[in-house]
C-alpha cells in the first residue's frame, strides 16, 4: 500500500508496514533533554532503579533555557543535569563552553539524521523534521521511559499535505509561510497530525526557512512537521560528521493524506500574528495601518535566530538607528552562528544601530530573562508563541513576525513594513 514519509519512517523502525492511527512501539534514535526538562526525567530515571542509559549515544542534554544561570534556582536546576551527564560520561552534553539553543545546535552538530525517530522534552522538537526525520515533543516522564528502554509508544499520525506554489516575494520567508498556514487552519487545525510541506516554494526555500516552518508545526497542534530530503538538505549535511547513516524516505504517489492544502506563496505579504494566538495573522500592510507603537523588538530563538536571520536584520539595520523609545535585543541561536556573524561584521552593525546582542539562549522567548516585558509593553518578536504572559507581564503583548519586520519595527518604533524603508 502507498505510504507517507512519516508512515515509512515508522515502518522502518518497527519492521513492518504501519499506517496512520496505528498504535506502535518504536525505537528512538535520539532523545533530547534540556536544563529545564531533564531534571524531572533524571528523577524518574533514578526512581525506576535504572543505572544505565539504554542508548547512551542516542541521548543528549543541551543547556539552553537559563544558561548562564539567571539565579540560584536555575543554577541548582542546571547542576542536576551536569551531575548526571558527568556521572554517565555523556558523549552529547552541551553546556556553556559550546552553547546553543537545542533545535539549532543539534542539526549543526550532525546529531539529527534523515530517517531518524527523535523525541525531546520540548514542544519545538518538531523543528528537526526539516531534515526528513520524524521528530516530536513529549513530556519529561516519556523522556525518562526512553532513557531507560530506548523506545516509546506512538499513534502513527495522519498527515496533512501542504503544497506551496509560486515564488516568495521580497522580505517574505519561511516564517511567513508557517504563520499563514496557522492563520488558515487555526491553532488546533493539525492536532496530532504530521504536517508535510512540499511544492516549488519549498524546493526553493533554504534550510533556515525550513527549520522555521517545522519548528512552528506545533503551533497548529501538529505532532510533527516534515520536509522530504532534497539537494538543499544534502548540501546542509555535507561535511557534517553525522551520528549515523542517513535514510531517505519519500511519500508515495497516492499516499493516504487526511487533507491536502494548497497555498499560493507568491500572493503573500510578510505575516504578523497578533496577540494572543499565532493564528491571529494579518499582513504587514494591514498591521502598518493599525499604527501600533512598540517598546521592544526581539530577533532570536529556535525559530529565527539563525545566520540568515541575522543577515536579514543587518541588511535592514545598516546605517540606521533603533528608535529612541524602543529596545532591540538580538540573540544568535548558537555560538557558531554568533562567531560567523562576528566575522561577517554583523555584530558591528547591530551595536552601532543601538541593539543589545546576548549570548545564545532561549531566554527572552519564554519570558525567562534577557528581554522580559513589563506591564503593558509590546514586542515584535521572531519567536513562536504569543499567549498571555509568554514573554513577561500578563498585560504585555507579543506580535510574531519575521526578522526583517522585527528589525524594521525597531527602527520605526512601531510595526513597520521592511519593504517601505
Swiss-Prot record:
GO terms for biological process: L-leucine biosynthetic process. It is an enzyme of class 4 (lyase). Pathway: Amino-acid biosynthesis; L-leucine biosynthesis; L-leucine from 3-methyl-2-oxobutanoate: step 2/4. One of its GO terms (molecular function) is 3-isopropylmalate dehydratase activity. InterPro entries: Acnase/IPM_dHydase_lsu_aba_1/3, Acoase/IPM_deHydtase_lsu_aba, Aconitase_4Fe-4S_BS, Aconitase_4Fe-4S_dom, HAcnase/IPMdehydase_lsu_prok, Homoacnase/IPMdehydase_lsu, IPM_dehydratase_rel_enz, IPMI_cat. The keyword Membrane does not apply. Pfam families: Aconitase (PF00330). Gene3D superfamilies: Aconitase, domain 3. [4Fe-4S] cluster binds at residues 302, 362, 365. PANTHER family: 3-ISOPROPYLMALATE DEHYDRATASE LARGE SUBUNIT 2 (PTHR43822:SF16), HOMOACONITASE, MITOCHONDRIAL-RELATED (PTHR43822). Heterodimer of LeuC and LeuD. Catalyzes the isomerization between 2-isopropylmalate and 3-isopropylmalate, via the formation of 2-isopropylmaleate. This is 3-isopropylmalate dehydratase large subunit. It comes from Campylobacter curvus (strain 525.92). The gene is leuC.
Amino acid at each position: 500500500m502507498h505510504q507517507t514519509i512519516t508512515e515509512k519512517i515508522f515502518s522502518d523502525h518497527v519492521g513492518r508496514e504501519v499506517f496512520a492511527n496505528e498504535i506502535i512501539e518504536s525505537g528512538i534514535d535520539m532523545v533530547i533533554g534540556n536544563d529545564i526538562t531533564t531534571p524531572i526525567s533524571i528523577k524518574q530515571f533514578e526512581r525506576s532503579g535504572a543505572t544505565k542509559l539504554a542508548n547512551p549515544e542516542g541521548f543528549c542534554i543541551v543547556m539552553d533555557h537559563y544558561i548562564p544561570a539567571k539565579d540560584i534556582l536555575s543554577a541548582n536546576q542546571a547542576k542536576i543535569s551536569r551531575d548526571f551527564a558527568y556521572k554517565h560520561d555523556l558523549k552529547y552534553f552541551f553546556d556553556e563552553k559550546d552553547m546553543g539553543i537545542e533545535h539549532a545546535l543539534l542539526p549543526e552538530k550532525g546529531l539529527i539524521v534523515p530517517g531518524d525517530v527523535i523525541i525531546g522534552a520540548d514542544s519545538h522538537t518538531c523543528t528537526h523534521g526539516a531534515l526528513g526525520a520524524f521528530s516530536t515533543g513529549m513530556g519529561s516522564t516519556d523522556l525518562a521511559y526512553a532513557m531507560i528502554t530506548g523506545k516509546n509508544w506512538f499513534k502513527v499520525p495522519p498527515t496533512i499535505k501542504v503544497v506551496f506554489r509560486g515564488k516568495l516575494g521580497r522580505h517574505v520567508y519561511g516564517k511567513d509561510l508557517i504563520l499563514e498556514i496557522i492563520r488558515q487552519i487555526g491553532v488546533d487545525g493539525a492536532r496530532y497530525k504530521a504536517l508535510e510541506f512540499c511544492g516549488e516554494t519549498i524546493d526553493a526555500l533554504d534550510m533556515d526557512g525550513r527549520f522555521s516552518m517545522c519548528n512552528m508545526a506545533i503551533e497548529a497542534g501538529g505532532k510533527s512537521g516534515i520536509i522530504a530530503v532534497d539537494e538543499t538538505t544534502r548540501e546542509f549535511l555535507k561535511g557534517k560528521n553525522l551520528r549515523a547513516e542517513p535514510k531517505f524516505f519519500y511519500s508515495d504517489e497516492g499516499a493516504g493524506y487526511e487533507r491536502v492544502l494548497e497555498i499560493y506563496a507568491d500572493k503573500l505579504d510578510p505575516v504578523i500574528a497578533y496577540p494572543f494566538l499565532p493564528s491571529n495573522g494579518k499582513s504587514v500592510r494591514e498591521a502598518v495601518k493599525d499604527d501600533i507603537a512598540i517598546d521592544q523588538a526581539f530577533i532570536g530563538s529556535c525559530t529565527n535566530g539563525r545566520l540568515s536571520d541575522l543577515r536579514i536584520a543587518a541588511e535592514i539595520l545598516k546605517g540606521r538607528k533603533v528608535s529612541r523609545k524602543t529596545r532591540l535585543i538580538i540573540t544568535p541561536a548558537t555560538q557558531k552562528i554568533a562567531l560567523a556573524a562576528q566575522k561577517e561584521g554583523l555584530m558591528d552593525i547591530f551595536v552601532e544601530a543601538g541593539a543589545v546582542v546576548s549570548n545564545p539562549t532561549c531566554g527572552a522567548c519564554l519570558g525567562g530573562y534577557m528581554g522580559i516585558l513589563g506591564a503593558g509593553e509590546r514586542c515584535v518578536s521572531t519567536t513562536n508563541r504569543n499567549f498571555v504572559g509568554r514573554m513577561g507581564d500578563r498585560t504585555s503583548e507579543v506580535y510574531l513576525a519575521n526578522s526583517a519586520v522585527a528589525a524594521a519595527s525597531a527602527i520605526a518604533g512601531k510595526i513597520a513594513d521592511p519593504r517601505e524603508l
